[in-house]
Amino acid sequence: MSSMTLFILFVSIIALLFLFINLIFAPHNPYQEKYSIFECGFHSFLGQNRTQFGVKFFIFALVYLLLDLEILLTFPFAVSEYVNNIYGLIILLGFITIITIGFVYELGKSALKIDSRQVITMTRFNYSSTIEYLGKI
């Protein structure tokens, strides 16, 4: 057998061994809340899993994926820059321009603004602006 085959076999055996050890020695405390649906920013209680939630979390995730794909698609250009010449540069700049226009559009529509559920009450304070409030902290 070659060294690469032995390496893959060894890593697979070690991974399965660690999974088996974890299965044996890890604490197991099942209860209903662990199996309930979890969404960041929302608390699920027993019997109340059908709560409404905003689509903004999914939009935020999609924007992250698009920008991540932008990095993945521009990386080959950076690696093979000496082969691409000016034609590849024009295509890359057009691609980045399209992604940037979409990102600016989403910023303009406030699609990336996620409302915080933690409200700071400033009723007993008499500050005219947020900057004045933060300056007192």
From Swiss-Prot:
The reaction(s) this protein catalyses: a ubiquinone + NADH + 5 H(+)(in) = a ubiquinol + NAD(+) + 4 H(+)(out)
Taxonomic superkingdom: Eukaryota
Chief place where the protein resides: mitochondrion
Keyword terms, alphabetized: Electron transport, Membrane, Mitochondrion, NAD, Respiratory chain, Translocase, Transmembrane, Transmembrane helix, Transport, Ubiquinone
GO CC terms: mitochondrial membrane; NADH dehydrogenase complex
Topology of the protein relative to the lipid bilayer: Multi-pass membrane protein
EC number in record: 7.1.1.2
InterPro entries: NADH_UbQ/plastoQ_OxRdtase_su3 (IPR000440), NDAH_ubi_oxred_su3_sf (IPR038430)
Family: Belongs to the complex I subunit 3 family.
Role played: Core subunit of the mitochondrial membrane respiratory chain NADH dehydrogenase (Complex I) that is believed to belong to the minimal assembly required for catalysis. Complex I functions in the transfer of electrons from NADH to the respiratory chain. The immediate electron acceptor for the enzyme is believed to be ubiquinone.
Name by which UniProt lists this protein: NADH-ubiquinone oxidoreductase chain 3
Source organism (scientific name): Podospora anserina (strain S / ATCC MYA-4624 / DSM 980 / FGSC 10383) (Pleurage anserina)
Taxonomic path: Eukaryota, Fungi, Dikarya, Ascomycota, Pezizomycotina
